[in-house]
Structures are given as C-alpha cells and as structure tokens.
C-alpha cells in the first residue's frame, strides 16, 4: 500500500512477484552512455504505473573498470512518488572459462554465520538461522558441489541447489572479504557495504 493506494502486482514465481514481475527491469532496453575509457552508464525510464508500481522512476547503473582490474557498480534511482526500489546485480560467474562446465568444483567461502531460510514457494520465512552443522556453512572454504544435491536438507530441495541469502559478518565494512570463489588459478573476491549476500547456483543439473 502506497500513498493510500493498494497495488496489485503481476506474479511470476509461485504466485509472487519476483524481480519486478514477468516484465521486470532486467528485460527492458537501457540507454547507454560512454563516460570515459573505463566507465559507462545505463539509464532506464519506468513510467508511473509500470507493472502497477507507483511513481515515474529514472534508474541509472554506472559500471567502472578500476585501475586494479575490479568492477565497480553503482545504482541510482529517482522517483516522484513513494515506491519500492531494490536494484542489484544478478551476474553469474564461471571461473573455469568454459560455460559448458558446472561450477561444482569451484571453492566457495562466505563470511557469514547465519542465513535466511525460504519456504516451498521460495519466500523468506522471516527466520535467521545458524549455518553451523548445515550445508549452508561456507565459513570454511569447500567445493560448491559437496552438498548441492543433498535434497534431504529442505533448503536445497526448495532451491534445487543454492539460491539463498547469507547474513554477512562484515557489518558493512567493505575492507573485509564478504565472499570468495576460487578455481584453478582464478579467484573472485567480493566486498560490499551491505549486510547480506545472495548466492545462486542455478539448478543442480546446470
């Protein structure tokens, strides 16, 4: 409910509206602009009432390749009404260099002692649970594939793998490592200022 108006949103996931619905922003065409040799911006205009969401929104994503070969992503959005905006990056990385190979041999570390479980419709339950003693524990680095088919664990069954949110121990300190993935000679390290981190492995047969 926004500004006294109850809004109904299009559903696309077990009766829920996921990622803005079936025509979410990820499916829209953005206006690209080259800022300099290392930076581009992508801008999208969403009109008031788009997918029943209130407010005309201008969303801007800025991608910068830094001097130390990192990718910096910044999000901005302006709107003329109260609305819901929760922009993020949804990239997938396969460090093997071969997209036909699964990521089950990738070594994953997540700096998190807790996670938020989901129900059978893939909505978070509101609980915050300990990872210790469960397949959700990546505080000691190990292969993603070790428990990815452990369907006796309900959370893996619901997600058909991993598609969960971990509560980071970093407390918003972006000088600490939030997560790391290693395979062969390649390493992907994530830092951020947020308190949560989501890992998605697609389905177990991919």
Where are these predicted regions, by residue range?
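An exposed, glycine/acidic-rich loop-and-rim segment of catalytic or binding clefts
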Residues: 1-206
């Amino acid at each position: 409910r926004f500004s006294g108006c109850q809004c109904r949103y299009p559903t696309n996931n077990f009766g829920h509206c996921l990622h803005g619905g079936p025509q979410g922003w990820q499916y829209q065409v953005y206006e690209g602009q080259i800022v300099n040799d290392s930076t581009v911006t992508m801008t999208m205009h969403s009109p008031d009432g788009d997918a029943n969401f209130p407010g005309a929104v201008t969303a801007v994503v800025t991608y910068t390749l830094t001097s130390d070969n990192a990718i910096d992503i910044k999000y901005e959005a302006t709107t003329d009404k109260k609305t819901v905006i929760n922009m993020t990056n949804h990239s997938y990385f396969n460090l093997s260099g071969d997209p036909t190979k699964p990521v089950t041999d990738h070594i994953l570390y997540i700096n998190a002692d807790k996670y938020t479980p989901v129900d059978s419709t893939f909505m978070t339950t509101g609980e915050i649970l300990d990872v210790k003693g469960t397949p959700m524990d990546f505080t000691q680095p190990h292969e993603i594939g070790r428990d990815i088919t452990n369907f006796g664990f309900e959370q893996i069954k619901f997600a058909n793998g991993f598609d969960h949110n971990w509560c980071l121990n970093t407390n918003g300190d972006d000088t600490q490592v939030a997560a790391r993935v290693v395979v062969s000679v390649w390493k992907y390290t994530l830092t951020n200022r947020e308190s949560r981190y989501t890992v998605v492995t697609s389905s177990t047969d991919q």
